[in-house]
A protein has these predicted regions:
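C-terminal and inter-domain tail/linker signature
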Residues: 1-121
């Protein structure tokens, strides 16, 4: 399975289907997190995702790109309160598993206009 396929499958199972039963297949035991609100390791991710699910997020994947062992996911996230966030998740893949994660999040962007007139992404 390619790194892009791994990420797409991970997002479908975890973010869309809210299923953590195969998390060991996707995430390294020593998963390293750089997001300011999420702790390291699988346990940190599990604590975060269970809290995140309470917002009933709807994920619309916009693009998945990769360069060797780095995969970027661009998506739109609509929360139950109507807020729309645009997110870029960046993963480092090692030995077929998510090893490290960074993210960039633009919060509540649907009504924001850029100076250029272009969309945020």
């Amino acid at each position: 399975m390619s790194n892009k396929e791994l990420i797409k499958k991970f997002y479908n199972e975890v973010f869309t289907n809210r299923d953590l039963s195969n998390l060991d297949d996707y995430m390294a035991d020593d998963y390293r997190q750089h997001s300011p609100e999420v702790a390291d390791k699988k346990s940190g991710f599990i604590a975060f995702i269970k809290q995140f699910w309470q917002f009933n997020p709807k994920i619309e994947m916009l693009a998945v790109t990769s360069d060797e062992n780095i995969v970027q996911v661009f998506f739109k996230c609509t929360l139950k309160n109507g807020h729309v966030n645009k997110v870029c998740d960046i993963y480092r893949i090692a030995s077929g598993k998510l090893q490290e994660h960074w993210d960039v999040i633009e919060h509540n962007v649907e009504d924001k206009k850029t100076v250029s007139g272009n969309s945020i992404f």
